[in-house]
Amino acid sequence: MPFIDRFRALTRAQRNTFAACFLGWTLDAFDFFLLTFCLTAIAVCFHTSRKQIEEAIFWTLAMRPVGAFLFGSMAEKYGRRPTLIVNVVAFSVFELASAFAPTLHSFLICRALFGVAMGGVWGVGAALALETLPPANRGFFSGLLQEGYVVGNLMAALLFAVLFPHLHGAGMFANWRVLFMIGALPALLGFYLNYKVEESPAWLAGRNAGAAKPARVSTDWRVIRGYLPIFLFVILLMTAFTSFSHGTQDLYPTFLQHDLHQSASHTGLIAAVGNIGALAGGVCCGALSERFGRKRTIVFAALLAIPMVPLWAWSHTAVALAAGGFLMQFMVQGAWGVIPAHLNELSPAPVRAVLPGFAYQLGNLLSSRNQIFQQTYADHYNAGSLKVALSATVVIVAAVVAAVTALGPEARGANLS
């Protein structure tokens, strides 16, 4: 079915729901990736090393499981829609607070709180979208939904490339602070969610049947323990997947600027081209997973990332690096594009808003030192150059993603109602 026809087949309510969930994940990622582009500028502002500022990435990732469990539990109890509204407003507020942080310590606290808010968006939004959309095109919309993360990265890259070189303010109006102020604008999405989006029909059906009884958070944890094998498998899978994405994204702008001496504009544009590849990969592989299966598509995309390493990390011209970035992110996010559908199909209905998001963010926690390990390895063995560390990350993690996926279960086409 052609791209446009898939959207035409949706009802107005389904289109509004998908748009809201996609935008929520997009703007969440936009706020997160602004930090990765501004690491050097923030280090200069706080008179510290870039490695110290990279701790902000760690604390953001480390606190995401807290948000996933907190907001996921709220979504099971109060509904997906109102929880997502609170979630979007919360991460926007903490992004704005980061812009006005006067010290490194307060900045790290703001990023940790941002991580709590960020942690809830994926699980709640994916549950709301995939419970609302028709099962026949679930793989396609899964790929498109997941690539909201990539679109957010693309927006951050373009904003950095276009605006950052022209910002020359100081103090509370330093260049990176202005970008973080812009990052607070996603709060406006809350109004759209409030007026245009309907609650998940699956959640409403459960409530009307008496299944959505008021529950304490501890009750949700007891329910999750009842599905411990699948929960542990998803944590392992998401640890590999988050190492795959963050290992190829978080320090890549720094690598381009510090190691290859690319300008801020070139860095932003190379990252933007990579994100266009990621968007294409996520949508294509998500759709292909309907035909070839979730597992097979993930394994294929992950392993094809390995041959892309030479062009991606060992080129020297901006054009070659952009081509490498496009191909690398096509494969990385191609594998990721299958994940929302894959995890929601594997997750039992009573914990669908909690389990995928919570396991995903626990995977983020377990891989949250990834960029620290990459930088430490580079400092100790390669005089600070990230080239070898980034290359090794892709080869090792791509193989692990393929192996774990191949050994796990699949539930393509499962009923989510």
Annotated model-derived regions:
Residues 1-30:
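Cytosolic juxtamembrane N-terminal segment immediately preceding the first transmembrane helix
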Residues 36, 227-279, 367-371:
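Extracytoplasmic gate region of multi-pass secondary transporters
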Residues 36-66, 265:
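Extracellular/periplasmic helix-loop-helix junction of adjacent transmembrane segments
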Residues 47, 79, 100-106, 134, ...:
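Helix-breaking motifs and short loop linkers at transmembrane-helix boundaries and internal kinks
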Residues 58-72, 272-284:
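Central cavity-lining transmembrane alpha-helices of secondary-active solute carriers
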Residues 66-102, 292:
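Conserved MFS/SLC helix-loop-helix module at the cytosolic interface between two early adjacent transmembrane helices
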Residues 139-164, 186, 357-371:
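Glycine-rich segments within core transmembrane alpha-helices of 12-TM secondary carriers
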Residues 289, 295-339:
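C-terminal transmembrane helical hairpin of 12-TM major facilitator-type secondary transporters
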